[in-house]
């Protein structure tokens, strides 16, 4: 009985934590528009992405997130345009959110080898909370749950909904062998209160991501295009939102057309609380990329107090890059350089 109560408490706290945190993706480079608005148009061609994540599938308090992204590069203006649609359903209480964001990014050449991209994003978001399945304090007595209907006034108002505008920005600098980016989401800290009686501001999220691309064998070219990539890419990401922060460190191995990766997520030098270590998950990834198409699968093995009872997290990513758009009267220019970060 004690173990069940502890598990319920852990799930409840994790769900409440999720209300003030953004959904996360382990394959963050497979969802570039969600990671950093500066990555809009970074494929230098029209691109479409789909990402699906199911976290804690073995529990009723699971988190299911789906996103669709589309972006395009406009070479005449050194600019990228993007659109991101995201839906998220968070476990206990059926908290659901839908977001539609538009992005603009500008690409600037610093020198022969180095580029910088800067991006802005405007988002319209809607959240709803279905109280079905939730219980409240007045439904309990000394003997436990009574089953009586709650008298909480907010429950009688139907399914509450809140909508708000949200703004984000980001930048990334890169060359053929490294990249480093910084993104700031929810700069305006919008109010997401359902009752409207008190402010419930969405905390700003700051994330830093960086890595290296190291060849372990010679590149194979087909004409002017890279035909087979053989690289090792160590990478890190740190993000902070409100009172919560997270660190990811891992390695990609690319041997075209296959990509494999392994990651650790957690901050071992920082504890959640006394005697509770900050170890979250170990992540493994397998991906396939052929021509313009990419598909990836990753699994998060939970190593926190939830353990294997949660079922970890499953994630699938799809991406397709269309033919480049060339102006009818192209002006003489140097060939732009794609981002060197992995595609998963």
Positions of PLM-derived features:
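Subset of outer-membrane beta-barrel
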Residues: 21-344
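Generic N-terminal leader/processing signal
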Residues: 1-2, 15, 34, 326
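Short, basic/polar N-terminal leader/transit segment immediately after the initiator methionine
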Residues: 2-6, 22-24
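Positively charged n-region of N-terminal signal peptides that target proteins for export
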Residues: 1-4, 110-112
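Sec-dependent N-terminal signal peptides
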Residues: 4-14
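Sec/Tat signal peptide C-region and signal peptidase I cleavage site
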Residues: 16-20
């Amino acid at each position: 009985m004690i173990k069940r109560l502890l598990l319920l408490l852990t799930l409840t706290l994790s769900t409440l934590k999720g209300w003030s945190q953004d959904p996360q993706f382990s394959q963050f480079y497979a969802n570039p528009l969600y990671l950093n608005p500066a990555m809009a148009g970074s494929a230098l061609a029209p691109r479409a992405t789909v990402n699906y994540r199911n976290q804690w599938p073995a529990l009723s308090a699971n988190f299911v997130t789906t996103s669709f992204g589309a972006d395009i590069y406009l070479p005449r203006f050194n600019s990228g345009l993007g659109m991101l649609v995201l839906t998220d359903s968070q476990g206990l209480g059926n908290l659901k959110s839908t977001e539609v964001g538009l992005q603009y990014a500008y690409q600037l050449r610093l020198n022969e080898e180095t580029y910088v991209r800067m991006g802005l994003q405007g988002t319209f978001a809607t959240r709803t909370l279905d109280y079905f399945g939730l219980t409240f304090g007045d439904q309990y007595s000394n003997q436990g749950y009574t089953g009586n209907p709650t008298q909480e006034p907010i429950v009688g108002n139907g399914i509450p909904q809140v909508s708000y505008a949200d703004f984000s920005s980001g930048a990334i600098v890169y060359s053929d062998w490294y990249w480093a980016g910084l993104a700031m989401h929810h700069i305006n800290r919008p109010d997401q209160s359902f009752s409207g009686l008190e402010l419930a501001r969405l905390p700003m999220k700051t994330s830093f991501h960086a890595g290296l691309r190291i060849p372990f064998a010679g590149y194979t070219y087909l004409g002017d295009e890279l035909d087979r990539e053989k690289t090792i890419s160590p990478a890190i990401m740190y993000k902070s939102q409100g009172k919560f922060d997270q660190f990811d460190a891992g390695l990609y191995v690319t041997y075209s057309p296959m990509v494999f990766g392994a990651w650790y997520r957690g901050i071992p030098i920082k504890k959640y609380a006394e005697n509770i270590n900050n170890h979250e998950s170990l992540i493994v990834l397998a991906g396939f990329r052929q021509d313009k198409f990419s598909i990836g699968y990753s699994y998060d093995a939970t190593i926190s107090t939830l353990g294997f009872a949660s079922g970890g997290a499953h994630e699938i990513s799809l991406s397709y890059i269309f033919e480049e758009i060339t102006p009818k009267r192209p002006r003489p220019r140097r060939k732009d350089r794609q981002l060197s970060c992995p595609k998963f």
